Regions:
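Extracellular glycan-interacting surfaces
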Residues: 1-316
Length: 316
């Protein structure tokens, strides 16, 4: 049964080339999906035909128990040797809404976790790391709830297909302004939430997340909505491809939602004026916006709800 499953798996339906043929045919861009393919085939459980992510968490907890039981030389002296002049990628940044002086600032690294400083205005701010032993530290997006500014949401996973991308594992939440955090069980161990490209929260506390699945054959990305603080989610925009990938979502000054799908395939730019219940596609060629873009990043002018910017990229 397992051999039949592998034979019919999408990976075995595509063209397989020799290394020499790959060099001639493979496009000149990062292809982490090929590494994900190999990783999937090496780590999947034949009995359930998928990767048992819940066991990874159990193994992590067991490793922590072993580490805690080992003797530690607390008198050891450490000296940092750097490098200290090279910054990693930071895709998530946010001024703390509870600091009316606009000094406290949050920043998330795609492979280095979540950090904050109490005073971003000084020339050399002191940065403090939030618990570095989160189940996942690939921080990709961050947002707060306008209806309760003590509530923050942090998404994980860098899903742009670059070679250094780190896969995520759902969304984290704080209800006390960042003092303590929990991982939303509704997003844990689910391929749909392996890469959270963007999170926004409207004035009523509704959460919208642009997601893409961890592997191109699994999960079901797109735009998801939660109206209960992240306890449950509903897909509100799926696009036109077999494996939809949410790229971005923004809220305009009048509350309208703008979302983009695609990333590695042409899908589109969409708008909703009823909290994500229905959507209209904007890149229809007839209005001057081309329909063949793959990745689309969006920005809405806070001063004018009628002004929307779209930064686009094609396959080449």
């Amino acid at each position: 049964e397992f051999e039949e499953y592998l034979a019919n798996h999408p990976f075995n339906q595509r063209e397989h080339l020799t290394p020499k043929q790959w060099k001639k045919k493979l496009v000149k861009k990062d292809r982490p999906d090929l590494a994900w393919e190999q990783d999937f085939l090496m780590t999947m459980d034949p009995a359930i035909k998928t990767v048992p992510k819940e066991r990874l968490f159990e193994a992590y907890q067991y490793a922590e128990e072993l580490r805690a039981s080992m003797p530690v030389n607390r008198d050891a002296s450490w000296t940092e040797h750097g490098p200290s002049n090279v910054a990693g990628r930071s895709r998530a940044m946010m001024f703390d809404p509870n600091d009316f002086e606009n000094k406290k600032f949050w920043a998330g690294s795609v492979s280095g976790g979540l950090w904050f400083t109490d005073d971003i205005t000084v020339s050399n701010p002191t940065w403090i790391a939030v618990d570095g032993f989160w189940e996942n530290i690939a921080i990709s997006t961050m947002a707060y709830d306008p209806s309760n500014t003590l509530v923050f949401y942090v998404g994980t996973g860098e899903g742009w297909g670059n070679g250094g991308a780190v896969q995520g594992n759902g969304i984290f939440k704080t209800e006390d302004g960042g003092n303590s955090w929990t991982q939303l069980s509704s997003t844990m161990g689910d391929d749909t939430f392996d890469f959270i490209q963007k999170i926004v929260v409207d004035e009523n506390g509704n959460i919208f997340a642009a997601t893409r699945p961890g592997y191109w054959w699994g999960g079901n990305g797109g735009i998801y909505k939660s109206s209960d603080g992240g306890n449950s989610w509903a897909q509100v925009l799926t696009g036109s491809t077999d494996y939809p990938k949410g790229a971005d979502i923004e809220i305009a000054a009048d509350g309208a939602l703008y979302a983009s799908l695609g990333i590695f395939s042409t899908d589109g730019l969409f708008k909703s004026v009823n909290n994500g219940e229905t959507w209209s596609q904007l890149n229809s060629e007839s209005n001057g916006f081309p329909s063949d873009f793959e990745r689309i990043e969006i920005a809405c002018a806070p001063s004018d709800a009628n002004i929307v910017y779209a930064l686009c990229a094609g396959g080449s």
